[in-house]
Curated annotation (Swiss-Prot):
Its EC number is 1.1.1.37. One of its GO terms (biological process) is malate metabolic process. The keyword Cytoplasm does not apply. The active site is at H193 (proton acceptor). NAD(+) binds at G17, A18, A19, G20, Q21, I22, G23, N111, Q118, V135, G136, N137. The gene is mdh. Catalyzes the reversible oxidation of malate to oxaloacetate. SUPFAM superfamilies: LDH C-terminal domain-like, NAD(P)-binding Rossmann-fold domains. Pfam families: Ldh_1_C, Ldh_1_N. This is Malate dehydrogenase. It catalyses: (S)-malate + NAD(+) = oxaloacetate + NADH + H(+). Substrate binds at R98, R104, N137, R168.
Length: 334
């Protein structure tokens, strides 16, 4: 690719599980500039397991066939030390899916075998400022495993995705109130990307009006919260496969906001290491309301927490603490 004078230097974006369903929806949008901006060239560094390298070669052929002006180069490998070399951004999508009859402990153990070596590889070879987003489930605890195995990187650089839940929460509220999604601001997803997550409308607005003035409490507690939390299962039921394009879109949103900033006066939901804000145990990778500026995120402070919210926030924190205990027991984190 010829670089015009004055264009930015390419940044390196590593994606794992790159030949999978989410990867297939994600890579073309990153290469088109949807994630880092229409003026930012990218080098894609794609990691797959050895048996999937042939399929990945096909995806690379398609990426090349799009002739994206921003796609400076593509690297493929089954070795994380190659795929993560000097990476500025890393989207950890590849994970072990839950199989029938699998207990949570089995799933955490299987994913530990993926995320521990990936954390170690990021620690060794990635850019010291790498921004890491874990998409592969159980995302919060997988992010914790990777983070704890990368002791030389700032723990704040490891995040997990609750943006899909956040976007689902916006869309469900828009539908209920008959308003466009653009009218909705400041929803929060607290906690784990699991059925214990808490989609919180207490601060949300629709065209500037408090959301909870526009919907009844019964609908909010009994329908809205479970619908958002169980949407993934509903999609599997309907499509026969898990949400891929919407997950990829949420990953792009998460990284774009982190890299380029959130709109003034608005926040989004990201699962980030808790600093003890809102009484959430320190170190858990937990969904919080965040604002982003200059490539950094900060947890929004000073929000009023009702008794209802407190109970929901503590329940999802408890689940994350149990997951952390389990991976400690397995020797995956300290």
């Amino acid at each position: 690719m010829t670089m015009n004078q004055g264009t930015k230097q390419p940044v390196r974006v590593a994606v794992t599980g790159a030949a999978g369903q989410i990867g297939y929806s994600l890579l073309f949008r990153i290469a088109a500039g949807d994630m880092l901006g229409k003026d930012q060239p990218v080098i894609l560094q794609l990691l797959e397991i050895t048996p999937a390298l042939k399929a990945l070669a096909g995806v690379v052929m398609e990426l090349r066939d799009c002739a994206f002006p921003l796609l400076a180069d593509i690297v493929t490998s089954d070795d994380p030390l190659v795929a993560f070399k000097d990476a500025d951004y890393a989207l950890l999508v590849g994970a072990m899916p839950r199989k029938a009859g699998m207990e949570r402990g089995d799933l955490l153990g299987a994913n530990g075998g993926i995320f521990k070596p990936q954390g170690e590889a990021l620690n060794k070879v990635a850019s010291r400022d790498v921004k890491v987003l874990v998409v592969g489930n159980p995302a919060n605890t997988n992010a914790l495993i990777a983070q704890q195995n990368a002791p030389d990187l700032d723990p704040k650089q490891f995040t997990a995705m609750v943006r899909l839940d956040h976007n689902r929460a916006i869309s469900q509220l828009a539908e209920k109130t008959g308003q466009p999604v653009s009218a909705i601001k400041n929803i929060t997803i607290w906690g784990n990307h699991s059925s214990t997550q808490y989609p919180d409308l207490s601060q949300a607005t629709v065209n500037g009006q408090p959301a909870l003035d526009l919907v009844d409490r019964e609908w909010y507690e009994k329908e809205y919260i479970p619908t958002v939390a169980k949407r993934g299962a509903a999609i599997i039921e309907a499509r026969g496969a898990s949400s891929a394009a919407s997950a990829a879109s949420a990953a792009i949103d998460h990284m774009r906001d982190w890299a380029l900033g959130t709109p003034e006066g608005e926040w989004v939901s990201m699962a980030v290491p808790s600093d003890g804000s809102y009484g959430i145990p320190e170190g858990l990778i937990y969904g919080f309301p965040v604002r982003c500026r200059n490539g950094q995120y900060e947890i929004v402070q000073g929000l009023e927490i009702s008794d209802f919210s407190r109970q929901k926030m503590d329940a999802t924190a408890k689940e994350l603490e149990e997951e952390r205990e389990e991976v400690r027991r397995l020797g995956l984190v300290k």
